[in-house]
Design a protein with these regions (language model features):
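Catalytic loop of short-chain dehydrogenase/reductase
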Residues: 13-20, 93-128, 132, 136-178, ...
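Short, small/polar-rich loop/turn modules that mediate ligand/substrate recognition or access, typified
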Residues: 176, 181, 238-240
Length: 261
């Protein structure tokens, strides 16, 4: 497949082979895209570089989205390497694990602000810098999770994702005049490193499997396929969208009574 042949893009947020960002990376590489990757610190460097090499990528950067100067430097480095960029995948999020369980009411100011900076505002900052080296037809994609409802053990991350989804719409408006598209994928629960921080995750997976329309959970390859579409020219008319990849769960009105019999 050569859907992405000649296109270059940045992947932010790969942690290991179970990462949603890795599933997206594989599909993009299979379609002919040339990829660059970010990591944070030596521990992730040891994981990310071998994965990048599997996709014939030698372009990797250490970058901390908490620091504005590092985001600016990241895209300066990409400009030096490639000149221009066609797409960015933002799969970056953080919250103190201890504050995901219990009541949202007990979220600390420090964790709220840090979680919002990393999980939400970083996408706006990335979009701003990426747009400087992105030609018309460029595309930005971020990852979210069911933010229209209150999810147990998700707390401040749910609030961050709500803000992130609002950011997608405003960024789509701002960048649309330049021919750039901005979208998000809202995936169902997937067994990733990030998801392991959510309490009662096994119940979440089982509930989604039992009550989604397709009666299964999605995986990183399902998300990768949708990301490929959204980042490719096939989605030239699509922007500002929250695209659900959750086996239909977000459209469930109430569970089927047969599942409780």
């Amino acid at each position: 497949m050569s859907l992405m042949k000649g296109k270059k893009g940045l992947i932010m947020g790969v942690a290991n082979e179970r990462s949603i960002a890795w599933g997206i990376s594989q599909k993009l590489a299979e379609a002919g895209a040339e990829l660059a990757f970010t990591y944070l610190g030596d521990a992730l460097k040891k994981r990310v570089i071998p994965l990048a090499e599997k996709l014939n990528s030698k372009v990797t950067f250490n970058s901390d989205v908490e620091k504005k100067e590092e985001v600016v430097k990241l895209f300066e480095n990409i400009k030096s390497e490639w000149g221009e960029i066609d797409f960015v995948v933002h799969a970056v999020a953080f919250s103190d694990k201890s504050e995901l369980s219990g009541e949202y009411l007990n979220t600390t100011r420090e964790n709220f602000l840090r979680s919002m900076l990393i999980s939400c505002f970083s996408f706006t900052e990335v979009a701003k810098e990426a747009s400087k080296i992105m030609e018309q037809g460029g595309s930005l994609l971020t990852l979210t999770y069911e933010s229209t409802k209150a999810i147990p053990n998700y707390n401040v991350m749910g609030v961050c994702k709500s803000a992130l989804e609002a950011s997608v719409k405003y960024l789509a408006r701002d960048l649309g005049a330049k021919g750039m598209r901005v979208n998000a994928i809202s995936a169902g629960p997937i067994k990733t490193l990030a998801a392991s921080a959510i309490g009662d995750a096994k119940f979440l997976y089982k509930w989604n499997e039992d009550h989604s329309f397709l009666k299964r959970n999605v995986d990183i390859h399902d998300v990768g396929n949708s990301a490929l579409y959204l980042l490719s020219d096939l989605a030239n008319g699509v922007t500002g969208e929250i695209h659900y990849v959750d086996a239909g769960y977000n459209k469930v009105g109430m569970p089927d009574p047969k599942n409780f019999s």
